[in-house]
């Protein structure tokens, strides 16, 4: 244990010192007067930088397969509403505190999201919302090096240490790493866990953006213990002792270590050059000097010649990506799931839209996959896949119509074939596309992947593919209002019963959903609200709460002539009662039950954020109302109570060299 602490301390210190060991590299301004290659007399070529480095110093974007442009970039800033600490009660997105690894085992989200793209589904996977995956790591483009150091803790034994650094070591070439050490404290046990998360990324954009390359390494080491599952709910509701250790649970000694590794590399090259042309014109102007003499000045005028638009079906950009994903579980059953995949794609969407918006954007590709599962060294199953995909976007005046489709075909099975087809119409009300109206329709067909005995797959040929048909609309007004409504038709829906056997619905059902997100501001007062309204025509197949809400009311002010920024406010969460699925810790499965309802309880937090130059401080009183509750009824799931009152605090330093 002492050696492990020493290794951990040394690693954190090295990560903290890395920003000072790397020399700052700043992207130089592009020299438009430099001649590059043969050109027409009087013309000069202005090569383009990636959009992400044009508008600021530090930006990041997320990995997306078959992407050749930085479509959206984000800037690290002060996070309001106390979100610096992992929220163990984000039930809307399905994050609950059921295990002491990270911030809790995921639950089925209160607001299901049907129609999502096809992907490998692993039931019982630990913490997909918190663990690092290729889909949520960050790639950066920076003008100056950027570093981040953070420490978060509580009055219990929780703590989080994070160190991150990114910089462009040469124009267009960025390297970065992000390491997090977590020690979440057990709620109902005296044990604790130490978890490690690390990702290292690099990406390169040539000066004209034609050559692009990305690579990433992602590693997780997560310990998961049983952290609840009361054998007697009355012991919790009637006992007001703050010492939860020793509370009777279902499987007290269940624990395992998850060790995950993912690798990704990709490169793409555009056959279409990207540049603007400039012509210099010199003119002579005469003016009267102070001594009444005529002074002649040479005035240089630069004309921008419109870019020569390529053909709609141009040569486009070609790319290839390869990935390796390993998820290993030891100590309980030594299960290992691995997937090898590649992606070959072509797209004619190579110009940034502010330069030239292609009226017909086409992306096509194919993605072969190979997956297999081992338990204790014995291969239990493997499967080869071939996944073709296509996406077409057509400009219709100011708006656009997008159609996309993908398939997952098991090469060694004639019956296994998944598919997804979607169509979206987007109409922007302004040129900046800040106010939009969107309508969509999505159809999916997915064969159930039932991962029982942890990651071992138990296929049942009797089960029909789960088919969904979704129609919906969404209205966005800047960042103030986001309203969406949708209706989804389910056929052959599949779930687990109380005996952990798969059950298929004999009748179809409808799920109606509405989501309203608002960010209101009146001077220095802010009110962020998220309201969910749902109705399932068959709650036995699809149990959901009728109403859920998440609200943040806070003041955001600057003090001492803008030197200090402060945010003081409250968070409130609530959802109506419903028959929530229950959790089985041994298999990691959620199964339907009709004996106990959860919900009908309000959770309240109070937080204070302070930002002084590049340092951010926060304190947060989590679940403050638990201090005066007459009876403990704050269950997240049947037999799984939530955490009581907890006091969190933390500090984050950001360095722009």
Locate the predicted segments by residue.
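Bacterial Sec-dependent N-terminal signal peptides
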Residues: 1-32, 316, 620, 645, ...
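Short, solvent-exposed aromatic-acidic interface loops
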Residues: 12, 218-223, 572-574
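Phosphate/oxyanion-binding loops and surfaces in catalytic or ligand/nucleic-acid-binding neighborhoods
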Residues: 16, 209, 577
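Membrane-proximal, glycine/serine-rich, low-complexity loop/turn segments characteristic
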Residues: 24-261, 271-284, 430-433, 639-645, ...
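Exposed, low-structure sequence patches enriched in small/polar residues
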Residues: 253, 257-657
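Small/flexible residues
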Residues: 4-7, 36, 517-521
